[in-house]
Amino acid sequence: MERKRIFAISGVKNSGKTTLICRLLEIFKDKGLKVAVLKHDGHDFVPDVPGTDTYCQLQSGAYGTAVFSAGKYMLVKQQPQISEKELAEFFPEADLILLEGFKYSTYPKIEIIRKGNSAESVCNPEKLMRSEEHTSELQSRSDLV
C-alpha cells in the first residue's frame, strides 16, 4: 500500500491558513490531483445547524448520523478522539492530504507567520518545510509544481 502524502498548513488563528489552502487546492485541481483537507478545530465545532434533521437527531441522542446523496456524503460521529492518520483513511483515493492547523503534529508543515498577526513560530522547527531536504523534495516534484 502506498504511503499517503500528508502535510500541514499551520499557524495561529487568522494567519491565512484557509486562504493558502484554497489557493493550493485550485492549483492542485488544475494539475488533476485529488486532494482532501482535514481541519482541526480546538473549539468542539457544531457539525450542523438547528432545524435540520441530522441536528435534531444528534441533539436527541444519536451517537452518529450520516446524510448522503448521489454525489457526496457527510458523516458525524460522537467520538472522544480520532487521529489525523485515522481520518486520512477515509480518503484512500486522495493523491495528497492537507492538514489545516495541526501545529503540534509530526507531519511536515508550512507555517504562516503574518506581520500584525503572529510574531514568531509556534511549530516545531524540525517539522517546518524550509530545510534543504524539504526544499529539494518539493522542487523535484513536477506533479506538485
Task: State what each model feature region is.
Residues 13:
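The conserved Walker
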Residues 9:
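Hydrophobic anchor at the beta1->P-loop junction of P-loop NTPases
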Residues 76-105:
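Phosphate-binding/switch loop-helix module in NTP-utilizing enzymes
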Residues 133-145:
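Single conserved hydrophobic/aromatic residue that forms the stacking wall/gate
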Residues 96-136:
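Phosphate/Mg2+-binding loops and adjacent switch elements
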Residues 19:
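Conserved Walker
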Residues 23-80:
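N-terminal phosphate/diphosphate-binding loop that engages ATP/GTP or pyrophosphate donors
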Residues 16:
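Conserved glycine(s) of the Walker
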